[in-house]
Amino acid sequence: VMKAKKIIIAIPTDFPPYGFVGTDLKPQGLDIDMANLIAQKLGVAIELAPVTSANRIPYLQTGKAALVISTLGKNPEREKVIDFTSAYSPFFQAVFAAKSMPITSFADLNGKSVGVTRGAIEDQELSRVAPTGAEIRRFEDNNATVAAFVSGQVQLIATGASVAGNMMARNPQLNAEYKLLLKDSPNFIGVAKGEDKLRLKVNEIIAEAKKAGELDRMAKRWLGRAAGDLPQ
């Protein structure tokens, strides 16, 4: 990378607010901000390579990209084929509602209606922790769940960070905010096996960005909450 003075970073363009194509047809989002930050700190030019969930790991394995910054969660299967840096951003399922609604614990959901997408991770987690007095209303897909919350059919919504970030950006009039965490599964940057020098350098950049508050700023800008403590 340093020799070529250029780094190719794989990013999502179909997953707002982490990665999407803006009105100017340029990729933008949290993952794109992170990619630009890394290239800037390495002092090299950047080439963004759009990937999907299916081809992002093959891009690393075949050397088409040096890094994958694409809402990548860490699990044992993936660790067999690629390496990971420290975590750089939160990815989470949570309960969101209007700022004016006082919700500080799951007990506060008593007597309230919560919209959720049937069978999604947040449905499973919510069913586990919600009090019996909460009315959980299930919808067939994320669009239907969001529509129910936006139109006021339900008072709260339980969904993933990306869906919520997108919803809040499109509907500022809702004045919605993050209320309760259901599940945390942070994002890591993927690096090809054997690229230890690059991996350690990126870890240094992540650690510095964390200390400088840059990771928190990025998460607040795109997800509505600070990055907080992320796993190494």
List PLM regions with ranges.
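Acidic, polar ligand-binding/catalytic clefts
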Residues: 36, 40, 45-108, 173-182
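Ligand-binding cleft/hinge of the Venus flytrap
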Residues: 21-22, 35-44, 122-140, 168-172, ...
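Ligand-binding clefts/hinges and TM-proximal coupling segments of bilobed small-molecule sensing domains
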Residues: 121-138, 176-178, 207-232
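Periplasmic-binding protein-like
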Residues: 89-97, 161, 165-207, 225-232
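Immediate post-signal peptide segment of exported/extracytoplasmic ligand-binding proteins
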Residues: 1-26, 102-103, 107-113, 232
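Short helix-initiation/N-cap motifs at beta->coil->alpha
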Residues: 32, 47-58, 137-151, 183-185
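Extended ligand-binding regions for polar small-molecule ligands
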Residues: 32-41, 103, 107, 112-113, ...
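Alpha-to-beta junction loops
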Residues: 7-8, 43-45, 51, 62-70, ...
